[in-house]
Regions:
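Bacterial N-terminal signal peptides
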Residues: 4-17
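Solvent-exposed loop and beta-edge segments used for protein-protein assembly and interaction
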Residues: 19-23, 34, 124, 139-141
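Tryptophan-anchored aromatic micro-motifs
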Residues: 21-36, 108
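N-terminal targeting signals for Sec/Tat export/insertion, comprising classic cleavable signal peptides
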Residues: 30-53
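Compositionally biased alpha-helical segments
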Residues: 52-59, 96-98, 108
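Disordered, low-complexity segments in secreted/periplasmic proteins that are enriched in proline
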Residues: 63-102
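Mature extracytoplasmic/lumenal regions of exported proteins
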Residues: 108-220
Length: 220
């Protein structure tokens, strides 16, 4: 065996375990009210570092600093007054009056920047890239799973998307599922409810999950 062929064999051998690795999660689902089969395949779960920018996008903004006390009247009041006006930035920036960034826009940016962790496949050739994948034990022996796709579910199959869509401008979709030990359960999505930050569990979530309509019937 020559040196170059030995190196090639070594590189291929290193790559084989990654290719042959089992997905962290594989589920099958059907959209309710439509004969639309879906396959959910998660290669791996998000790391804390990968989830952090998306959680930060929905975190409450930090409290604004208290304004400085007005200068006391006296001999130096004139100089103090001029300094105060200059500090505001006048015509230049209007610093304190700037509108806070839109949480939806921040989350969209964070989703796009995240690595692809899997796909949700429909009956076509185009899948939905999964950019966020989290799971934890839930009630009654079930597992809670939260996924975020970069594109809106149903973007290429509008016939099965429930109407009205709560956030029609959102490019991504948050999918939250509850499944039992056999992989049977339900899934709901941000197509019909809003996205929230579950601060206790430290994950993205659906606001009012229990009241949201079921979008997916899930099986293993």
């Amino acid at each position: 065996m020559t040196g170059s062929s030995g190196i090639l064999f070594f590189v291929i051998a290193l790559s084989l375990p990654a290719i042959a690795a089992e997905p962290a999660l594989t589920l099958h689902a059907h959209a309710t009210g439509a004969d639309v089969p879906l396959t959910v395949e998660v290669f791996r779960w998000s790391t804390d570092a990968e989830r952090a920018p998306m959680l930060a996008a929905l975190a409450p903004p930090a409290a604004a600093p208290q304004p400085a006390a007005a200068p006391a009247a006296g001999g130096d009041a004139g100089r103090g007054g001029r300094a105060g006006r200059a500090g505001r930035g006048g015509r230049g920036g209007g610093g304190g009056n700037a509108a806070p960034p839109n949480p939806l826009a921040r989350l969209t940016t964070a989703v796009k920047a995240a690595p692809t962790l899997g796909f949700i496949w429909g009956d076509g050739v185009t899948g939905y890239s999964i950019k966020y994948a989290w799971h934890a034990p839930a009630d009654a022996g079930r597992e809670r799973i939260v996924l975020v796709t970069e594109r809106r579910l149903g973007a290429h199959a509008p016939g099965w998307v429930p109407a009205p869509v709560v956030t029609p401008d959102a490019e991504f979709t948050v999918v939250e599922m509850r499944v039992d030990a056999k992989g049977v359960g339900e899934g709901k999505a941000s197509l019909t409810t809003t996205v929230a930050l579950d601060a206790k569990a430290q994950t993205l979530a659906l606001d009012g999950y229990d009241a949201a309509p079921v979008l997916l019937k899930v099986t293993r």
